[in-house]
């Protein structure tokens, strides 16, 4: 099975383990990720201004490239997934935005939202199947109590992302069970870590990330996993929690369970 793949900027520098473990794991599971040629930064955040076109053109270009290959587009970084998914929705359902974007792009074939954008976790759940992931595990993570941290961008806005219930998600907990770990459910797992506020007011990010960390520790989690490099940064660098849990990318645990982590 082949899928086009948009890694995003951070996975090429600060979050290389998220990318490397993802590729190795899917190879073991019989899925090939074909990285897009000459992709560009998605912008990192989806502007809610309806007349803001320029910042979204790189995402449109990536979506059109996957369409031209005839492949679904897989994403991994929560922020990239959010931007690409919302841009795709705008191209499919908002005529004025789509017309303006296509006018700028001057593509041979105008893009109208034809590409299906799926997150890596959705690929594991809906294409590979968590049962097949479980069958491929050679190093089950038994005894590891892991808290899944969703954050804001992976699930919201729910009507567009359509990955899981944004208020009571289960996809990461089901993933953790498939690799043999014990998922720990805690209230703040889909609350904001502080996000980009860290660039303007670190105190906000510290307050938010500390609340997440304390809540997970209180519920007896031994570690956290996330799909978001920014969340991983805030939880690791800005939390002032008394108990500082280690924070891993979910693909690191997947690669360990499948026996493909160096």
Model-derived features: where do they sit?
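Iron-sulfur cluster-binding electron-transfer modules in prokaryotic oxidoreductases
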Residues: 1-262
């Amino acid at each position: 099975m082949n899928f086009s793949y948009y890694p995003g900027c951070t996975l090429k520098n600060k979050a290389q383990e998220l990318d490397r473990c993802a590729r190795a794991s899917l190879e073991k599971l019989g899925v090939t990720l074909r990285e897009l040629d000459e992709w560009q930064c998605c912008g990192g955040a989806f502007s809610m201004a309806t007349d803001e076109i320029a910042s979204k053109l790189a995402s449109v270009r990536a979506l059109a490239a996957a369409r031209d290959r005839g492949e679904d587009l897989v994403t991994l970084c929560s922020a990239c997934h959010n931007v690409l998914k919302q841009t795709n929705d705008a191209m499919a359902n908002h005529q004025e935005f789509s017309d303006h974007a296509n006018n700028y792009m001057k593509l041979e074939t105008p893009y109208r939202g034809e590409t299906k954008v799926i997150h890596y976790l959705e690929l594991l759940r809906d294409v590979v199947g968590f049962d097949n992931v479980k069958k491929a595990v050679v190093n089950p993570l038994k005894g590891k109590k892991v808290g899944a941290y969703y954050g804001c961008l992976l699930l919201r806005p729910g009507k567009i992302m359509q990955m899981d219930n944004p208020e009571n998600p289960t996809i990461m907990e089901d993933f953790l069970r498939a690799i043999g770990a014990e998922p720990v459910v805690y209230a703040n797992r889909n609350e904001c870590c502080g996000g980009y506020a860290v660039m303007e007011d670190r105190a906000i990010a510290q307050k938010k990330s500390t609340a997440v960390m304390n809540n997970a520790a209180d519920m007896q989690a031994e570690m956290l996993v996330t799909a978001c490099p920014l969340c991983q940064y805030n939880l690791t660098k800005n939390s002032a929690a008394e108990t500082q849990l280690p924070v891993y990318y979910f693909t690191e645990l997947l690669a360990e369970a499948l026996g493909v982590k160096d």
